Amino acid sequence: MKFVLLFGVLLVTLFSYSSAEMLDDFDQADEDELLSLIEKEEARAKECTPRFYDCSHDRHSCYRSELFKDVCTCFYPEGGDNEVCTCQQPKHLKYMEKAAGKAKKFGGKIKKWFG
């Protein structure tokens, strides 16, 4: 019985040690991957595509407005076979930005009245 208990404790200890090493390796790989992604994002951020311009070369290059990033929207023009992609802001995000701007403006008025 003592042998089984000792063997069980040894097995659990070895398993926890090996899993901790594997997690450390995964964490290191994740950090390296994250750093490379950040470097790519910084390099790509220099080439932003303005709103309503062609974004078919890089669909993630659209400008960022105050709160939200524009989306590359693709469609087929009427009577055409070629796909056209442009950076656009979805309407619901446009309305949310307008509401946030008005709330900010109203908050400034309240501060002025009571502050």
Swiss-Prot record:
<dbReference type="GO" id="GO:0090729">
    <property type="term" value="F:toxin activity"/>
</dbReference>
<feature type="disulfide bond">
    <location>
        <begin position="62"/>
        <end position="87"/>
    </location>
</feature>
<feature type="disulfide bond">
    <location>
        <begin position="55"/>
        <end position="72"/>
    </location>
</feature>
<feature type="signal peptide">
    <location>
        <begin position="1"/>
        <end position="20"/>
    </location>
</feature>
<keyword id="KW-0800">Toxin</keyword>
<feature type="disulfide bond">
    <location>
        <begin position="74"/>
        <end position="85"/>
    </location>
</feature>
<keyword id="KW-1015">Disulfide bond</keyword>
<dbReference type="GO" id="GO:0005576">
    <property type="term" value="C:extracellular region"/>
</dbReference>
<feature type="propeptide">
    <location>
        <begin position="21"/>
        <end position="44"/>
    </location>
</feature>
<keyword id="KW-0964">Secreted</keyword>
<comment type="similarity">
    <text>Belongs to the neurotoxin 19 (CSTX) family. 01 subfamily.</text>
</comment>
<protein>
    <recommendedName>
        <fullName>U3-lycotoxin-Ls1l</fullName>
    </recommendedName>
</protein>
<keyword id="KW-0732">Signal</keyword>
